[in-house]
Amino acid sequence: MGEFSTLLQQGNGWFFIPSAILLGILHGLEPGHSKTMMAAFIIAIKGTVKQAVMLGLAATLSHTAIVWLIALGGMYLSRAFTAQSVEPWLQLISAIIILSTACWMFWRTWRGEQQWLAGNHHHDHDHGHDHDHDHDHDHDHDHDHDHDHHGHIHPEGATSKAYQDAHERAHAADIQRRFDGQTVTNGQILLFGLTGGLIPCPAAITVLLICIQLKAFTLGATMVLSFSLGLALTLVTVGVGAAISVQQAAKRWSGFSTLARRAPYFSSILIGLVGVYMGIHGYTGIMQ
């Protein structure tokens, strides 16, 4: 069985490049700061589709720059470990890190989903209680109606029926307070997107560890660009969806919220499979 880098260089890029694009798409679907911040920002400023695309591309640009720095740094450092006796150990260590990352992502997603389900159940209970109370007091009907209507002014996509983790809710609420109804310039939109994309991600670590094993700059660069392309597709789509009201999609298709909630599970499984693949090759190389 050939080495991991040799398999890629001899024509297996057709599998790993689409996988990198898929990884980027799934990373963009994960509950995280960049996606939620952009959606909340576009909704708060009542942004256009053009502004949403601009914001998504800016976030992708900065996110890609971070991945490039990490990947190039890893490829530079890997030159010190060219001996065949050392490479299998690097693959095995990389596999352990990747599998740990995948397990952490899976656990974080499960915990966030449980918190959302508990909070949504509590919200439904309170809503039903208020309805019974208003029914018994005709005099307070107008006051209660106005109060309830005001209390349900939320950013689209941040309602009780849409899944978000704790960090997403906090950032969306903060952005809604700061930018609600304000007029912003294109420069401010670009700056917001660039800073929002600087947050590190577990998927970038996976791309880094794969590139370390490639020992081929062209294919390694292609992998990073493929990941960035997938991320750009998701971030731009999210921004445009916020601009044209993603709630309409949720109303027309009941499975929309479920898909957004379950996407991180697929992402963590994909990362885990990459870790298993690298681990098998590392273990095989050590035993030879």
Curated annotation (Swiss-Prot):
Induction: By nickel and cobalt. Transcriptionally repressed by RcnR. Gene3D superfamilies: Nitrogenase molybdenum iron protein domain (3.40.50.1980). One of its GO terms (biological process) is cobalt ion transport. The lineage of its organism: Bacteria, Pseudomonadati, Pseudomonadota, Gammaproteobacteria, Enterobacterales. GO terms for cellular component: plasma membrane. It is found in: Cell inner membrane. Efflux system for nickel and cobalt. The gene is rcnA. Residues 123-155 have a biased composition (Basic and acidic residues). Keywords: Cell inner membrane, Cell membrane, Cobalt, Cobalt transport, Ion transport, Membrane, Nickel, Nickel transport, Transmembrane, Transmembrane helix, Transport. It comes from Salmonella paratyphi B (strain ATCC BAA-1250 / SPB7). Its main location: membrane. It is a multi-pass membrane protein. This is Nickel/cobalt efflux system RcnA.
